């Protein structure tokens, strides 16, 4: 209690704020300029520094509260909060698990449309499937008052759904009912259940909300089951294999029901994500995004899920503010949809609103605390503001939630360990854990590049042999490079010059073709620049790096644009122009989403710059402050 009550108050106010007649404002230390870099230094004596006075007062307050205060701090629970647990599948076929899970999701999404309720996301409750935990424990873990549980039995063209609403604290059954109807009435059953629960919880239902809940997405139930399978894989992880399975199921659903707007919208989202992650940036993939999105808009332009797909596409085209408008419009219709808060947060840290972004992610986390993907994004929000302790905390939560699919959590955690501690061995150990549990392509590429940058060329080649992809991300997704470049670097380091020359030539040909295929993609230009740099084609390397940066500067995207600055800096470093490399890095130094001196000191890709006089001078000033 002492620590909880005293220290956070002292730390938050003392380290961040000053009291002024206008209220609390951020504390600013004296500014010292060193070789063009601004470094904050507080030169006042210890006893005159407000942060230390507040810290002392916080300790005293904590002791007083611990001695005389209450015995515990209780977590408040919203009186109209609910979690819909995965319904039990009482059907004979295991294939009906997707069908049963789909009903759970539909009822959850219906309730999420009711502004008067707080509804835990479907992603967070699926971990309780087949759980033997008591209702009160589950409710405490999810922070809700009510639990809805039920069962589904599908037999031929009939479906029986049983549901009961429980006040978890008192273990009192607030509502229960059963429905035994034809499969064609499924959506009406789900709507009836949702409205009955809302009434039992005394939630206000508007006519608009009722109309949304009663909307029928398709008359083809077989297509709808395939659609639900697709959504399961779409939101399962960031892995390419899951996205590919989602694509297959969406396509099957569309084959059965060519007028299924939501299936087209979902397919467009997955294709968009495959491009965004760098798995396939071909023009053909881009055409598939546009075709499916346009088809969805043509079929049902005002559907919230279609508008959500449109917002996602606008976002990925970096039309951020139109995307924000679409997201906010959908949020009015789906106020409990954590995905929308998450998407708004993504925009915010791309338009330099990092604190606002993190706040939205934390709000989303409250209603979706068991989603590994969302938890990773919360960790990234902290990492972008250089709070590595909190970042690692959330990455660990994601890994514990889903150790076999949270590939990005291992990767980001590995980065944070390097940045915070400079612990190269532990960083690689975390990557190895991720590779062992997930076989993730990006983790294998990250380990390969780190080993090569450390001069462990044979180990790098052995690691790369575990992943057969032609291309991979480099410099945190700032560039796409071919595997032949890494092989050339390794063989060159091993003294096998002829082999190195062969692979460098292949890398050059492949990247030039990539640029020709995707001339507007910043990552391909940056990747070609990196290849040219390693071939000592200096002018060409700089030109490609500058082109990548011109396509996506930080002013256009304060998240990914920073990586283009890094790519150009890396190119300058490889060709031996270290001053120009440092000039580039200086433009993103100590800004949220950028880099700190820890990046230069601890990340192996910047090892050539560590002993540069400018870096030494900056570090000396940092230590003195």
Where on the chain are the PLM-derived regions?
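An N-terminal, helix-rich hydrophobic module
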Residues: 1-63
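Catalytic-center loop of serine/cysteine hydrolases
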Residues: 45-46, 51-79, 93, 103-249
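TPR-adjacent "capping" and linker segments in tetratricopeptide-repeat scaffold/adaptor proteins
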Residues: 76, 209-228, 298, 473-479, ...
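Short beta-strand segments enriched in small/hydrophobic residues
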Residues: 80-90
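Proline-centered turn/helix-capping motifs that create local helix->coil transitions or kinks
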Residues: 198-209, 300-301, 458, 539-542
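Short coil/linker segments at helix-helix boundaries
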Residues: 223-352, 366-377, 383, 549, ...
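Alpha-helical protein-protein interaction modules
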Residues: 314, 327, 331-332, 356-625
């Amino acid at each position: 209690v002492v620590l909880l009550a005293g220290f956070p108050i002292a730390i938050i106010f003392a380290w961040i704020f000053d009291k002024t007649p206008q209220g609390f404002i951020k504390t600013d230390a004296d500014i010292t300029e060193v070789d063009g870099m601004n470094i904050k230094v507080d030169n006042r004596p210890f006893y005159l520094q407000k942060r230390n006075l507040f810290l002392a007062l916080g300790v005293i307050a904590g002791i007083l509260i611990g001695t005389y205060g209450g015995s515990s701090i209780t977590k408040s629970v919203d009186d109209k909060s609910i979690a819909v647990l995965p319904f039990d599948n009482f059907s004979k076929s295991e294939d009906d698990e997707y069908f049963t899970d789909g009903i759970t999701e539909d009822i959850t999404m219906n309730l999420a449309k009711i502004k008067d309720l707080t509804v835990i996301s479907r992603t967070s409750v699926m971990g309780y499937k087949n759980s033997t935990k008591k209702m009160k424990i589950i409710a405490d873990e999810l922070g809700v008052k009510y639990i809805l549980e039920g069962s589904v039995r599908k037999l031929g063209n009939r479906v029986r759904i049983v549901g009961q609403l429980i006040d978890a604290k008192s273990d009192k059954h607030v509502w229960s009912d059963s429905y035994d109807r034809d499969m064609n009435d499924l959506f009406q059953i789900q709507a009836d259940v949702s409205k009955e629960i809302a009434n039992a919880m005394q939630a206000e239902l508007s006519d608009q909300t009722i109309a949304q809940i009663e909307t029928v997405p398709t008359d083809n139930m077989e297509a709808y089951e395939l659609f639900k399978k697709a959504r399961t894989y779409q939101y399962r992880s960031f892995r390419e294999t899951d996205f590919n399975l989602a694509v297959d199921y969406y396509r099957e659903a569309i084959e059965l029901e060519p007028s299924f707007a939501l299936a087209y919208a979902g397919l467009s989202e997955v294709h968009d994500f495959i491009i965004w992650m760098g798995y396939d940036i071909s023009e053909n993939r881009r055409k598939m995004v546009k075709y499916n999105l346009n088809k969805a808009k043509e079929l049902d332009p005002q559907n919230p899920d279609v508008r959500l797909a449109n917002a996602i596409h606008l976002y990925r085209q970096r039309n951020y503010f139109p995307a924000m408008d679409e997201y906010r419009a959908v949020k009015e219709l789906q106020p409990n949809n954590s995905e929308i808060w998450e998407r708004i947060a993504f925009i915010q840290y791309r338009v330099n609103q990092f604190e606002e972004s993190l706040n939205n992610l934390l709000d989303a986390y409250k209603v979706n605390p068991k989603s590994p993907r969302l938890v990773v994004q919360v960790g990234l929000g902290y990492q972008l503001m250089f709070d590595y302790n909190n970042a690692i905390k959330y990455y660990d939560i994601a890994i514990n939630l889903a150790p076999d699919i949270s590939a990005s959590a291992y990767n980001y955690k590995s980065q944070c360990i390097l940045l915070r501690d400079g612990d190269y061995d532990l960083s690689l150990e975390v990557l190895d854990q991720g590779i062992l549990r997930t076989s993730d392509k990006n983790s294998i590429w990250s380990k390969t590049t780190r080993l090569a940058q450390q001069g462990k060329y044979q180990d790098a080649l052995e690691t790369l042999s575990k992943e057969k992809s032609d291309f991979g991300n480099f410099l945190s997704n700032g560039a796409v490079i071919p595997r032949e470049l890494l092989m050339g670097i390794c063989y060159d380091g091993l003294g096998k010059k002829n082999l190195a020359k062969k692979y460098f030539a292949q890398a050059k040909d492949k990247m030039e073709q990539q640029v020709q295929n995707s001339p507007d993609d910043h990552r391909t230009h940056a990747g070609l620049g990196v290849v040219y740099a390693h071939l000592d084609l200096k002018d060409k390397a700089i030109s490609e790096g500058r082109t990548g940066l011109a396509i996506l500067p930080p002013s256009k995207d304060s998240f990914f644009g920073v990586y283009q600055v890094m790519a150009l800096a890396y190119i300058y470093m490889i060709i031996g122009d270290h001053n120009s490399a440092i000039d580039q890095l200086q433009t993103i130094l100590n800004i949220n989403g950028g880099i700190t001196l820890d990046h230069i000191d601890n990340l192996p890709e910047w090892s050539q710059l560590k002993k540069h006089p400018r870096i030494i001078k900056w570090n000396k000033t940092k230590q003195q402050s």
